[in-house]
Swiss-Prot record:
Disulfide bonds: none annotated. The modification Pyrrolidone carboxylic acid is found at Q1. It is found in: Secreted. One of its GO terms (cellular component) is extracellular region. Belongs to the bradykinin-potentiating peptide family. One of its GO terms (molecular function) is peptidase inhibitor activity. It comes from the Eukaryota. It comes from Vipera aspis. The keyword GTP-binding does not apply. This is Bradykinin-potentiating peptide. Expressed by the venom gland. Signal peptide: none annotated. GO terms for biological process: regulation of blood pressure. This peptide both inhibits the activity of the angiotensin-converting enzyme (ACE) and enhances the action of bradykinin by inhibiting the peptidases that inactivate it. It acts as an indirect hypotensive agent. The lineage of its organism: Eukaryota, Metazoa, Chordata, Craniata, Vertebrata.
Length: 10
């Protein structure tokens, strides 16, 4: 799942 940041996890 994504989050507000430069990278997104699964």
């Amino acid at each position: 799942q994504g989050w507000p940041g430069p990278k997104v996890p699964p």
